[in-house]
Swiss-Prot record:
Its EC number is 5.3.1.6. Substrate binds at T28, G29, S30, T31, D83, G84, A85, D86, K96, G97, G98, G99, K123. One of its GO terms (molecular function) is ribose-5-phosphate isomerase activity. This is Ribose-5-phosphate isomerase A. The gene is rpiA. Homodimer. It catalyses: aldehydo-D-ribose 5-phosphate = D-ribulose 5-phosphate. HAMAP family: Rib_5P_isom_A (MF_00170).
Length: 232
């Protein structure tokens, strides 16, 4: 069974949590796209929900699928956000942002009563860090921000290289918010909460891809079926 089928099965399991009248956060990335497509099928059959997209890509996908959309300017809270992850550990802490939407993803997740993460089983790791950690930054003063980031890595017991994410045109990748992304290739993050705290206070850092204590449920699809992990 290929990974796309596993992602779709995880998305289908998360869809079972959706009820009519819910307000949903719609994640970004290949796994979240499967959820949006399956949700669209339910909407066409009469399910009434409203969604808040976490990126312009997801907005376009949701509109194509006939999903009614709104924004966090119009509603206060969401019932559930369903999103993917680049890595998830056994504490249900995550690395997200491989698709470049980490800022909006975190805003939407924080405004939700529950966050359900959907993924194939390869995303479950003992320690975060194998997947490069995305850090969204302001272009101004990039050199100073880089130096501050390296100091934060050292303080958190990490070591690694920072690379500016390229876009398709060969220039720097630009997020929906107009920022750049530095990908930190750390290999291993021994204390994700500590690193998250250190990154959050650096001037020039808009947001980082460590989602600590945010996921309520993780749905993992593997060759042996679906595994659901709930936050203790």
């Amino acid at each position: 069974m290929d990974k796309e089928e596993l992602k779709r099965r995880a998305a289908a399991r998360a869809l079972e949590e959706v009820r009519g009248g819910m307000k949903l956060g719609l994640g970004t990335g290949s796994t979240a796209k499967h959820f949006v497509e399956l949700l669209g099928e339910r909407v066409r059959l009469g399910l009434e929900i409203i969604g808040v997209p976490t990126s312009e890509v997801t907005r376009a996908d949701a509109e194509r699928c006939g999903i009614r959309l709104t924004s966090l300017d119009e509603i206060d809270r969401l019932d559930i956000t369903i999103d993917g992850a680049d890595e998830v550990d056994h504490h249900l802490d995550l690395i997200k942002g491989g698709g470049g939407a980490l800022l909006r993803e975190k805003i939407v997740a924080a405004a939700s009563d529950r966050m359900i993460v959907i993924a194939d089983e390869s995303k479950l790791v003992d320690t975060l860090g194998r997947f490069p950690l995305p850090i969204e930054v302001i272009p101004f003063g990039l050199g100073a921000t880089r130096r501050a980031l390296q100091n934060a890595f050292t303080a958190a017991g990490c070591d690694g290289e920072l690379k500016l994410r390229p876009g398709k045109d060969g220039h720097a990748f630009v997020t929906d918010g107009g920022h750049w992304i530095l990908d930190a290739q750390l290999g291993r993050i021994p204390d994700a909460p500590r690193l998250a705290q250190l990154l959050s206070v650096i001037p020039g850092v808009v947001e980082h891809g460590l989602f600590v204590g945010m996921a309520s449920t993780v749905v993992l699809a593997g060759a042996d079926g679906i595994r659901t992990i709930e936050r203790a």
